[in-house]
From Swiss-Prot:
One GO biological process term: positive regulation of toll-like receptor 7 signaling pathway
Protein name: TLR adapter interacting with SLC15A4 on the lysosome
Superkingdom of the organism of origin: Eukaryota
The record's note on its domains: The pLxIS motif constitutes an IRF5-binding motif: following phosphorylation, the phosphorylated pLxIS motif of TASL recruits IRF5.
Keywords linked to the UniProt accession: Cytoplasm, Endosome, Immunity, Innate immunity, Lysosome, Membrane, Nucleus, Phosphoprotein
Subunit composition and interactions: Interacts (via pLxIS motif) with IRF5; leading to IRF5 activation. Interacts with SLC15A4; leading to its recruitment to endolysosome.
Biological role: Innate immune adapter that mediates the recruitment and activation of IRF5 downstream of endolysosomal toll-like receptors TLR7, TLR8 and TLR9. Following recruitment to endolysosome by SLC15A4 downstream of TLR7, TLR8 and TLR9, specifically recruits IRF5 transcription factor via its pLxIS motif, leading to IRF5 activation and subsequent expression of type I interferons. Plays a role in the regulation of endolysosomal pH in immune cells such as B-cells, dendritic cells and monocytes.
UniProt-listed InterPro entries: TASL (IPR027869)
Protein localization: Lysosome membrane; Endosome membrane; Nucleus; Cytoplasm
Modification sites for Phosphoserine: 291
């Protein structure tokens, strides 16, 4: 009974010997001290000796188990710390791998485009869709839809981007005083007020917002042309009577008169006559050239 603690300690030692082999000598030293203390106990009564030996054996075995588990946990923590230090280098080092890592992010979705559409990322470097950044993708990546899937329609549409300025712009238009306006300038007068208020609310303007604005202006120009030709039986030259175009004519005339030292009225007549020569009976969509985002100053 006196060696019960020593025997129980050997049982636990055999079970976990593989996990703490580096700590054999310290554990053996502790074991020797505990068994020597147990062997030194002597009692006159057999019952007292059995009770005391059982208590000491349980106590010694508990100390042995706790010490072994503590050292095993320290050993595992040191191993995990070594693994973390070995893998401390970032995983995504190249731009392609960085794009893949961003694409896997659930919070911020990234829209990757095929190699044939890399000009979108170059010309529209600030383009966002629903808060996600548009990036280029390497052609060697697998599991990406083929380019034929983009042939049904445009890859990106400006109409899909909602503008928060529309509600505030409509409220500002209702507060404006009503004035008698001409027949041909009414349409462009309202739109010019709306565009001025919208352009002043967001600076600098991103390419996506500018694209949508230009698309709307082209559609409005088509509508104005159809209304003038069908309902009023007028020629396309009457579109020059609108306030939107005449304002630009005045600005051009003023600039030319300052540069050439000529009368403003004469320069205005020259500009209008030149525009009338360029007007044709057919209308076509102009070629739009949008500057880079870095060139726009707030």
């Amino acid at each position: 009974m006196l060696s019960e603690g020593y025997l129980s300690g050997l049982t636990y030692w055999n079970d976990i010997h593989w996990n703490c082999a580096s700590y054999n000598e310290p554990v053996a030293g502790d074991q020797g001290k505990e068994t020597s203390s147990v062997a030194a106990l002597s009692y006159s009564s057999v019952d007292e000796t059995q009770v005391q030996s059982l208590y000491v054996s349980c106590k010694s075995s508990g100390k042995f188990i706790s010490s072994v588990h503590a050292r095993a946990s320290q050993h595992s923590r040191s191993q995990s710390r070594t693994v973390l230090q070995a893998n401390s280098n970032p995983v995504f080092e190249s731009p392609t791998l960085a794009a893949v890592g961003i694409c896997r992010d659930v919070i911020r979705e990234t829209y990757l485009v095929p190699p044939s559409c890399k000009s979108i990322c170059k010309n529209y470097n600030d383009l966002h869709i629903a808060g996600g950044q548009v990036m280029a993708i390497n052609s060697v990546m697998a599991n990406f839809p083929s380019e034929s899937s983009f042939e049904d329609g445009p890859l990106l549409k400006s109409s899909e981007i909602s503008l928060s300025m529309e509600d505030s712009t409509s409220t500002q238009l209702t507060e404006l005083p009503l004035k008698p306006i001409q027949r041909y300038s009414s349409y462009w007068r309202i739109t010019s007020i709306k565009e001025k208020s919208s352009l002043q609310m967001q600076k600098p303007i991103s390419n996506a917002v500018l694209n949508e604005y230009l698309e709307q202006k082209v559609v409005e120009l088509y509508k104005q042309y159809i209304m003038d030709t069908v309902f009023h039986d007028s020629s396309p030259t009457q579109i020059l009577a609108s306030e939107f175009i005449m304002t630009n004519v005045d600005q051009i005339s003023l600039q030319v008169s300052k540069e050439k030292n000529l009368d403003t009225s004469k320069v205005k007549d020259i500009v209008i006559s030149h525009l009338l020569q360029l007007v044709s009976s057919e209308i076509s969509t102009p070629s739009l050239h949008i500057s880079q985002y870095s060139n726009i100053t707030p």
